């Protein structure tokens, strides 16, 4: 049985993993194998930007981003909610079920898990999530199921909102008092010699950015991870799904990527 000291684990799943059934099968297979031996509770939070991009292209609708966040016109949110809370969520649920897991598909709104408000009028139907009531989610976890949660939420007035998946994962982890791992294409942050940096704070990250060690798209990932650690008030981890043999170590509380430290 799991040590009582291990809090639930929230895994934010992103990057190319969402579009690769083999990668997903390796991830869910590792979760199934781990949970046969240990009882740590695991939650998946996902986005699905690639599905939205494909949908927008098919419908010949422009994709506009502001400061890295997708602008979501209110007349498009039903389509985007369908892609994320519908297609992406059910594809993940289906793969998890095929790999032997009792998976349940949810959104941020279910059971009042997260409270969502409009983030910025210029972004349209884009929401900011804050931790809400985790009782329904905890009941599902206690039943031995794997919740798979999309980053679609509802305001108190019932308005659909698209929430950045990293930020959604922070809110879910906050509601559950859980450890958070952002699982993506990258193994973490590398130093100038290509070695994995085990932990990073804002001051160290600023120095690496100034020294051109952290560049381009990685700057956005690093700043988002540090912001997530600050929001959650505890260290979070960025790790990769590329090495399934390492995933069970991650589930057991061992660091396999870069730990981002709150200020």
Swiss-Prot record:
Subcellular location: Cytoplasm
GO cellular component: cytoplasm
Function comment: Catalyzes the ATP-dependent phosphorylation of N-acetyl-L-glutamate.
Organism field: Vibrio vulnificus (strain YJ016)
Binding site for substrate: 48-49, 70, 162
Site positions per UniProt: Transition state stabilizer: 12, 221
Protein name per the record: Acetylglutamate kinase
Record family assignment: Belongs to the acetylglutamate kinase family. ArgB subfamily.
EC number(s) recorded for this UniProt protein: 2.7.2.8
Pathway field: Amino-acid biosynthesis; L-arginine biosynthesis; N(2)-acetyl-L-ornithine from L-glutamate: step 2/4
Main location: cytoplasm
Keywords assigned: Amino-acid biosynthesis, Arginine biosynthesis, ATP-binding, Cytoplasm, Kinase, Nucleotide-binding, Transferase
Record's catalysed reaction(s): N-acetyl-L-glutamate + ATP = N-acetyl-L-glutamyl 5-phosphate + ADP
MF annotations from Gene Ontology: acetylglutamate kinase activity; ATP binding
HAMAP family named among the record's database cross-references: ArgB
Signal peptide: none
Single biological process term from Gene Ontology: arginine biosynthetic process via ornithine
Top EC group: transferase
């Amino acid at each position: 049985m799991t040590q009582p000291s291990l809090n639930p684990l929230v895994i934010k799943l992103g990057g190319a993993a969402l579009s690769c059934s083999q990668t997903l099968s390796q991830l869910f297979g590792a979760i199934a194998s781990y949970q046969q031996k240990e009882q740590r509770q695991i939650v998946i939070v996902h986005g699905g930007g690639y599905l939205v991009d494909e949908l927008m292209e098919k419908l010949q609708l422009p994709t506009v981003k502001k400061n890295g966040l997708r602008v979501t016109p209110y007349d498009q949110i039903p389509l985007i909610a369908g892609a994320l809370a519908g297609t992406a969520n059910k594809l993940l649920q289906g793969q998890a079920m095929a790999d032997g897991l009792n998976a349940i598909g949810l959104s941020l709104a279910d059971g009042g898990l997260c409270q969502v408000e409009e983030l910025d009028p210029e972004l349209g139907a884009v929401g900011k999530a804050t931790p809400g009531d985790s009782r329904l989610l905890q009941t599902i976890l206690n039943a031995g199921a794997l919740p798979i949660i999309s980053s679609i939420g509802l305001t108190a007035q019932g308005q659909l909102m698209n929430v950045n998946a990293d930020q959604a994962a922070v809110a879910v982890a906050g509601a559950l008092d859980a450890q958070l791992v952002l699982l993506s294409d990258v193994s973490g942050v590398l130093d100038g010699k290509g070695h994995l940096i085990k932990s990073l704070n804002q001051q160290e990250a600023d120095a690496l950015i100034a020294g051109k060690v952290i560049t381009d798209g990685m700057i956005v990932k690093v700043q988002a991870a540090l912001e997530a650690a600050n929001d959650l008030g505890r260290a979070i981890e960025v790790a990769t799904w590329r090495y399934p043999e390492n995933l069970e170590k991650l589930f057991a509380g061992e660091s396999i990527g870069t730990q981002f430290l709150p200020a």
